[in-house]
Amino acid sequence: MITGKTHVTGIMGHPLGHSLSPIMHNAAFRSLGMDWIYVPFPVKPENLKAAVEGLRALGVEGVNVTIPHKEAVLEYIDDIHGTAALIGAVNTLKFDDGTVRGYNTDASGCLRALEEVTSVEGSSVLILGAGGAARACAFQLAEKGASDITILNRTPEKARLLAEDMADKLGFEASYGGYELIQGSVKSADILIDTTPVGMHPHTDDRPLVGAELMHEGLVVHDLVYNPQRTVLLREAERASAIPVSGIRMLLYQGVEAFRIWTGRDPPLDVMEDALKRVLNRD
């Protein structure tokens, strides 16, 4: 039962119809018997400042932040934590005695998903795409000791800007270019991360940017798309005896880290994962 003592968390963005975060977090709260709830807060860009101040005033514990607010919200928070400051975007806010702190758990989620199957330190990484998720992964993996990172994007200029930002903030010299460089780049990569929406529901049969013929045995292939769980890219990885990593892993681990930030407790990983898979299998 929701009462005046119930601790409130949630997610704010626009639109929000696709979010699986309420399912994942509410399953964890129920499993632990916590008087907490996670709800969606649709917030249009023009209402972002008012939303942050309103959540602060209402005593909300924290929220996830999604498109299109991850960068814009920086203007309205008091403190930004760790890697999030380098990335220049946050996906998690914690309200603590009137102070609003920002975190980027996409970054740690990407790292943990990869570390289930490989070591990032000393690895050669190829990232497809140059948007917010690509930024989070690139900065986190550079900080964790990747030997080299190549960023390829449909618009090479955007990849160049990300690489230059990494050089300015980390002193890390990433390579960059357009998709015409994919073939040569995959050959030398230990880890491939596709941050593009190619293959996302309902366009599940779209040809991936990298097919099995370009992959090699042992290549770690992380597709950030999680619906479907087994994308065409991951099926191609299996054909090539590469190592597929589903987007559900990053989704799960970014949620796990946000849960810890808000509650100070370790969530039941298996419960959160089962809740996600039940919904995705139903869809």
UniProtKB/Swiss-Prot annotation:
NADP keyword on record: yes
Enzyme Commission numbers on file: 1.1.1.25
GO MF terms held by the record: NADP binding; shikimate 3-dehydrogenase (NADP+) activity
Keywords of this entry: Amino-acid biosynthesis, Aromatic amino acid biosynthesis, NADP, Oxidoreductase
First-level EC class: oxidoreductase
Biological pathway: Metabolic intermediate biosynthesis; chorismate biosynthesis; chorismate from D-erythrose 4-phosphate and phosphoenolpyruvate: step 4/7
Domain of life: Archaea
Pfam families named among the record's database cross-references: SDH_C, Shikimate_DH, Shikimate_dh_N
Quaternary organization: Homodimer.
NCBIfam families xrefs: aroE, PRK00258.2-2, PRK00258.3-3
Function field: Involved in the biosynthesis of the chorismate, which leads to the biosynthesis of aromatic amino acids. Catalyzes the reversible NADPH linked reduction of 3-dehydroshikimate (DHSA) to yield shikimate (SA).
Entry-linked PANTHER family: BIFUNCTIONAL 3-DEHYDROQUINATE DEHYDRATASE_SHIKIMATE DEHYDROGENASE, CHLOROPLASTIC (PTHR21089:SF1), SHIKIMATE DEHYDROGENASE (PTHR21089)
Record-stated family: Belongs to the shikimate dehydrogenase family.
Record-given protein name: Shikimate dehydrogenase (NADP(+))
UniProt organism field: Methanothermobacter thermautotrophicus (strain ATCC 29096 / DSM 1053 / JCM 10044 / NBRC 100330 / Delta H) (Methanobacterium thermoautotrophicum)
Gene: aroE
